[in-house]
């Protein structure tokens, strides 16, 4: 099974056609939608299903100009690093020896290693957080999470914050490692995310199960 197989199947379903119709209608009204059309499915482009080792769930894309490009928590290289990603880097620096904090927030090199950076809602209207949360994307991304759980073994799922943690019911914990904490946003990072040790625990599990690990330093 590949992403193309999953996408081809889902695109035939009424809910998916409704999503595409909604986006086309909103664009026709002159509304700005992020990420741009060609970047909406970048998480699937950069992390092949066969190579997938880790899933990090976000909620919806960044809603300001030049930020969102289809990967959860990631921004274009020339954009300021968002606060949540700054806290992700802080946890990496705290827990990973010799981690070098990048001067950018472009996470494509994680994605290419098998870190699937999936927002549960794939689009957003400019400057309106969560504006597309009810248009059907979660039906699609819930299916994706479930397909990963059913068709892969020994994947590490990082669920940060209450929204992501609700997706735990879609994952078979007997086949995969589920790591949970508060969200890395400034509002909640100090209530459990900073100090969670997820990146260390992730690599311990991957080494044990697959004799592989993620090079979190590869961004530098």
From Swiss-Prot:
Q: List the disulfide bonds.
A: none
Reactions catalysed, as given in the entry: Hydrolyzes single-stranded DNA or mismatched double-stranded DNA and polynucleotides, releasing free uracil
**SUPFAM superfamilies, sorted:** Uracil-DNA glycosylase-like
InterPro entries in UniProt: UDG_fam1 (IPR002043), Ura-DNA_Glyclase_AS (IPR018085), Uracil-DNA_glycosylase-like (IPR005122), Uracil-DNA_glycosylase-like_sf (IPR036895)
Gene Ontology cellular component annotations, sorted alphabetically? cytoplasm
Q: Where does this protein reside within or beyond the cell?
A: Cytoplasm
Key word RNA-binding present in the record? no
Which Pfam family, just one, is annotated for this protein?
UDG
**Which terms does the UniProt entry file under GO BP?**
base-excision repair, AP site formation via deaminated base removal
Which GO-annotated molecular functions does the record name? uracil DNA N-glycosylase activity
Q: Does the keyword Cytoplasm apply?
A: yes
| Principal subcellular localization | cytoplasm
Query: What keywords tag this UniProt record?
Result: Cytoplasm, DNA damage, DNA repair, Hydrolase
- For this protein, the Enzyme Commission number is 3.2.2.27
Active site positions: 60 (proton acceptor)
Q: Which PANTHER family match?
A: URACIL-DNA GLYCOSYLASE
Protein family: Belongs to the uracil-DNA glycosylase (UDG) superfamily. UNG family.
Q: What does this protein do?
A: Excises uracil residues from the DNA which can arise as a result of misincorporation of dUMP residues by DNA polymerase or due to deamination of cytosine.
Indicate what this protein is called per its UniProt record: Uracil-DNA glycosylase
Q: Which organism is it from?
A: Francisella tularensis subsp. holarctica (strain LVS)
Q: Which gene is annotated as encoding this protein in its UniProt record?
A: ung
């Amino acid at each position: 099974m590949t992403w193309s197989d999953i996408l081809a199947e889902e695109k035939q379903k009424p809910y998916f056609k409704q999503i595409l119709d909604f986006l086309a209608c909103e664009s026709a009204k002159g509304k700005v939608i992020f990420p741009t059309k060609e970047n909406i499915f970048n998480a699937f482009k950069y992390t092949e299903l066969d190579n997938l080792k880790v899933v990090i769930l976000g909620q919806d894309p960044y809603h300001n100009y030049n930020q969102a490009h289809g990967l959860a928590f990631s921004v274009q290289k020339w954009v300021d690093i968002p606060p949540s990603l700054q806290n992700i880097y802080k946890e990496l620096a705290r827990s990973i020896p010799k981690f070098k904090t990048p001067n950018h927030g472009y996470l494509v090199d994680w994605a290419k290693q098998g870190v699937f950076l999936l927002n549960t809602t794939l689009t957003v209207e400019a400057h309106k957080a969560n504006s597309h949360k009810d248009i059907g994307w979660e039906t699609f991304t819930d299916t994706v999470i479930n397909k990963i759980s059913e068709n892969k073994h020994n994947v590490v799922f990082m669920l940060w914050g209450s929204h992501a943690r609700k997706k735990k019911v879609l994952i078979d914990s007997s086949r995969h490692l589920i790591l949970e904490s508060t969200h890395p946003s400034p509002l909640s990072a100090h209530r459990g995310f900073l100090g969670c040790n997820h990146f260390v625990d992730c690599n311990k599990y991957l080494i044990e199960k697959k004799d592989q690990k993620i090079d979190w330093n590869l961004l530098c």
